[in-house]
């Protein structure tokens, strides 16, 4: 049996980090290299197992098996994740400050590149700041996971600068309505096709010029527009095996839809079923107000959650009002 060089605790076979103190286990890393599973980058898989299991209506053991399987497949891609269960140190959901203290300790010891949060803000809280960039009552505050990247809870509205080259690369997977096993299988399949982008873009007609200027950096294909394209016709335009979507539409905190625009006409361009027929794992980028808003919603009234329930493996959007230019 191997033992941790830092704290002396016994090590389980194959682990990359000491389960007692979090120290990196170099012996197991060398063993992984020898077995053809070289770890190039390291990351933290961060959650609260009891709360996550309760939300998923599974046992902690069942959830652990799912997460450990993901860790194994990620290692085959050169990423060594350490599973960190915040409930070992924090009672209940805890505060952002408490979670950052845990993550800081792991970062200082192991220098990971990635932080993958598993669970909604009810599992691992997001910080909430006063929104200094908006006069809208509905946007009086803004929630963010930025502190988990910078390890700093100070509001960006205070004017400080960030060195993002040296920050954690952070993603969050809300568990609401999601089949974790299905998501991780899609992630594994989709990651193997990163170089085979097949794209689709849809813009509100009034922003077509701006959208085309962005899209040209991704693809030489046309940008479809709404009202010409609506939620009842979009499936006819999406080609088989499309795996990269770009949307520049209106959104609302009152409804689950995304909208096009021409003049004073705002037709429904997207709903929660619009991408349910996509058969390949895909990446989605959206510039729409509340495009990534999910708190208090479910898969039937959130395009974000319905996408993640389907084949979406990465979603980039705004949880509040999105600001952009109407032309290049």
Feature names for model-found ranges:
Residues 31-328:
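Cysteine-dependent hydrolase recognition
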Residues 1-30:
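Cys/His-rich metal-coordination motifs, chiefly Zn-binding "fingers/knuckles"
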